[in-house]
C-alpha cells in the first residue's frame, strides 16, 4: 500500500503523475483550520506533506501523528516550526539549488531599475510627460564600476557577485558568517565587517534568511551609516529589515533609493508609504518567479519527498539529524 501524502499546491500534470506513482495523494488548496477539520482523516494518516507558503506549526503537526517528512517548494522555511519538526523527528526538505541563478537575475534587475529609474521614467512616458529632450530630472546613476556590498554570501550572493564582477566591473564587498574563498578568488570580493560595508558600498544588497539573529538586522542605525547616494536592495526576507526605519531613511534622504522584492507584511498593504515613493521599486516577491524555475522547484520538491520517505536525506534536507 502506498504511503499517503497531503498536497497543498497545484503541480504541473507530469509532476502530479510522478507523485501519484509513489503515493496516495490528497490535494487541497490550503492548510487553514477549516480545511484540516474537513479532511481530518487524510491529515491523520499522512506520512508526507508537500506545498509552499502555508504555516506549518505545532497545531497542525498535532493533527498529523504519522507525518514523517515535509517538502516545501521553496528555499526559505521560516513558515515552518523547525523545533517542533525536530522534536517529532519529521524531516524538512527544501529547494536551495533550483532557484539560485533566477533570484540573482532579480537582484541585478533591482540594481539596474533603481539606478536608472526604469519604472519611474517608464510611467512618466506613459503619462505623456516626454514632450522634449530629457533633462537632469530624468537622469539616473551609473552601475558599472560602482561598489557592490553583499550581505549574505551564499549561493545567491555568489551568483550576484559573478554578474556584478564580470558584467559590470563592480568592486565587491561582502559580509557573511565566514570568509568565502571562491568569492574572493573568482570575483576579487573583499570580506569586511557590516559597518564598513554599509559605509563604503554604493549598492547594499541584502540576501539573508530570516532567523532570530537576522530579524531587523538592518534598522535606523544601519541606514544612518550608509552613503546618502547609496541604493538599498532586499531580496532575502522582509523582516530582516526594520521597514519603518527604511521608510524614514528614504523620507529623510539618508539613502538615495531602494529596490525591494520582500516586505515585513506580504502582500504589501496598499497604504504603505513605500508605494508613494518614486525612488522605490516594489516587486511582489518575484525572486524565483519564472516558469522554468518554478517548474524546477516543484520537480525538486516532489523528488525530495520521494527521497525523504525512502530514507534518502543526503541532499536538500534542513534537519537530516532527525533521521539518524
From Swiss-Prot:
Active-site residues (renumbered): 237, 266, 285 (proton donor)
PROSITE patterns according to UniProt: D_2_HYDROXYACID_DH_3 (PS00671)
Alphabetic keyword roster: Cytoplasm, NAD, NADP, Oxidoreductase
Record's subcellular location: Cytoplasm
InterPro entries attached to this UniProt entry: D-isomer_2-hydroxyacid_DH, D-isomer_2_OHA_DH_cat_dom, D-isomer_DH_CS, D-isomer_DH_NAD-bd, Glyo/OHPyrv_Rdtase_B, NAD(P)-bd_dom_sf
Main location: cytoplasm
Record's keyword annotation contains Transcription: no
Catalytic activity: glycolate + NADP(+) = glyoxylate + NADPH + H(+); (R)-glycerate + NAD(+) = 3-hydroxypyruvate + NADH + H(+); (R)-glycerate + NADP(+) = 3-hydroxypyruvate + NADPH + H(+)
Subunit structure: Homodimer.
Protein name: Glyoxylate/hydroxypyruvate reductase B
Record organism: Enterobacter sp. (strain 638)
Lineage of producing organism: Bacteria, Pseudomonadati, Pseudomonadota, Gammaproteobacteria, Enterobacterales
Amino acid at each position: 500500500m502506498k504511503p499517503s501524502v497531503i498536497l497543498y499546491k497545484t503541480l504541473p500534470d507530469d509532476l502530479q503523475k510522478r507523485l501519484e506513482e509513489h503515493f496516495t495523494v490528497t490535494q487541497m488548496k490550503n492548510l487553514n483550520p477549516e480545511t484540516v477539520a474537513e479532511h481530518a482523516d487524510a491529515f491523520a494518516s499522512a506520512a508526507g506533506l508537500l506545498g509552499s507558503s502555508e504555516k506549518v506549526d505545532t497545531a497542525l503537526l498535532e493533527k498529523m501523528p504519522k507525518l514523517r517528512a515535509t517538502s516545501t517548494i521553496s528555499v526559505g522555511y521560516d513558515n515552518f516550526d523547525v523545533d517542533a519538526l525536530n522534536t517529532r523527528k519529521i524531516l524538512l526538505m527544501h529547494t536551495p539549488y533550483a532557484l539560485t541563478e533566477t533570484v540573482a537575475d532579480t537582484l541585478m534587475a533591482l540594481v539596474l531599475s533603481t539606478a536608472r529609474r526604469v519604472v519611474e521614467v517608464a510611467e512618466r512616458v506613459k503619462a505623456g510627460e516626454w514632450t522634449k529632450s530629457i533633462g537632469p530630472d530624468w537622469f539616473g546613476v551609473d552601475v558599472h564600476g560602482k561598489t557592490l556590498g553583499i550581505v549574505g554570501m551564499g549561493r545567491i550572493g555568489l551568483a550576484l557577485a559573478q554578474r556584478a564582477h564580470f558584467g559590470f566591473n563592480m568592486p565587491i564587498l561582502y559580509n557573511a558568517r565566514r570568509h568565502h574563498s571562491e568569492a574572493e578568488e573568482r570575483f576579487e570580493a573583499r570580506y569586511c565587517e557590516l559597518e564598513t560595508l554599509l559605509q563604503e558600498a554604493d549598492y547594499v544588497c541584502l540576501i539573508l534568511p530570516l532567523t532570530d539573529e537576522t530579524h531587523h538586522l538592518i534598522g535606523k542605525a544601519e541606514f544612518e551609516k550608509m552613503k546618502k547616494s547609496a541604493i538599498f536592495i532586499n531580496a532575502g526576507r522582509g523582516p530582516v529589515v526594520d521597514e519603518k526605519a527604511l521608510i524614514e531613511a528614504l523620507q529623510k534622504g539618508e539613502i538615495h533609493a531602494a529596490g525591494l522584492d520582500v516586505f515585513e507584511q506580504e502582500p504589501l498593504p496598499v497604504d504603505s508609504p513605500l508605494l508613494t515613493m518614486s525612488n522605490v521599486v516594489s516587486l511582489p516577491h518575484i525572486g524565483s518567479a519564472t516558469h522554468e524555475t518554478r517548474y524546477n522547484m516543484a520537480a525538486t520538491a516532489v523528488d525530495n519527498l520521494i527521497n525523504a520517505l525512502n530514507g534518502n536525506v543526503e541532499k536538500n534536507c534542513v534537519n537530516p539529524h532527525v533521521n539518524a
